[in-house]
Structures are given as C-alpha cells and as structure tokens.
A protein has these predicted regions:
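A compositional/biophysical signature of low hydrophobicity enriched in polar/charged and small residues
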Residues: 1-156
Length: 156
C-alpha cells in the first residue's frame, strides 16, 4: 500500500470533486507549484492509486433510471469444483453489471445493474443470469429511491 501524505490527499480530494481542473488551478487552490501537482498526480497514476479520469453521467437523463441489486448463489458441482472466484469473474464480464462483489452469507455474489425499467432488468435476469452455468439462483432487489450514490472516497 502506498502511504499518502497530506498534499497527496488534498490533490486527490480536489480531483474527485472535479478532475478537469488544470494543475495550475489545483496548485493555486492547494498552495503548491503546478509542477509539483503534476509530478504527484503522475506518480499516483503510475502506482495505480488513480485508475483513470471519467465523466459521471446522470443515469435518469440517459434512460437508465432503474437500479437493482441482485444476489447470486453459485452452482456447486457434486465434485465441488466451482470456486467463488469463478462466479465473480463471470459476472464481472457482463456489460450490464456496474459493480460485482463476492459476499458472505447465503448468497455468494452481489451485483448492481441499471436499466430502463424493472421489466427490462427482470428479463435480463431471466435471460442472462438464469442461463449461466455458474448460477444456481438469484434474488433481485429493486431500488425505489436512491438516498446516496457517490464515487468520492473519504481520505483520512
């Protein structure tokens, strides 16, 4: 793990708010030369702390207002040869899946899916997930209200 100092944390906090800021603007805000900001950003990118820079889209405005969390139980062959990682890898490859996690408990994975409607997501679950050899069963939870969605990580 890379140890972040206060300057790195300040830079990352600002980039999470608005990654389109120039190094000059960031430097002015943070009281650092633009070259220092640039070097630190480059170092953090090279070390994998910054995975990339992207636009955050409004799902409703692009026609994907419906969110579902789907719990997935993996199918275990009688010889026990289906590992949890396999289901995670298989789910992560599906373009409709925004997030995929291996979890503890009765189910083995949790995925987040967005779609135009509950009907569309339901059809996708039946047509796609239920036809995967790795999947034994699913439990779909439709989200009726989004209290918070954030891509900002709190740096302490």
């Amino acid at each position: 793990m890379y140890e972040l100092d206060k300057k790195d944390k300040d830079i990352l906090a600002e980039l999470q708010k608005n990654c389109r800021q120039s190094t000059r603007t960031l430097g002015r805000k943070l009281g650092m030369p633009a070259t220092t900001v640039y070097q630190r950003i480059t170092r953090m990118r090279n070390r994998g702390l910054i995975k990339g820079f992207s636009a955050i889209l409004d799902p409703e405005k692009i026609g994907l207002p419906t969110v579902a969390m789907v719990l997935v139980k993996r199918y275990v062959r009688k010889d026990g040869k289906m590992k949890s990682e396999h289901i995670g890898q298989a789910l992560a490859k599906l373009p409709e899946v925004q997030e995929a996690y291996l979890v503890t408990g009765e189910y083995d994975a949790l995925i987040k899916v967005r779609g135009k409607s509950e009907k569309e997501i339901g059809k996708w679950v039946v047509d796609t997930l239920w036809n995967m050899p790795e999947v034994e069963r699913t439990l779909t939870l439709f989200c009726f209200y989004e209290s918070k969605e954030s891509h900002i990580l709190q740096l302490k």
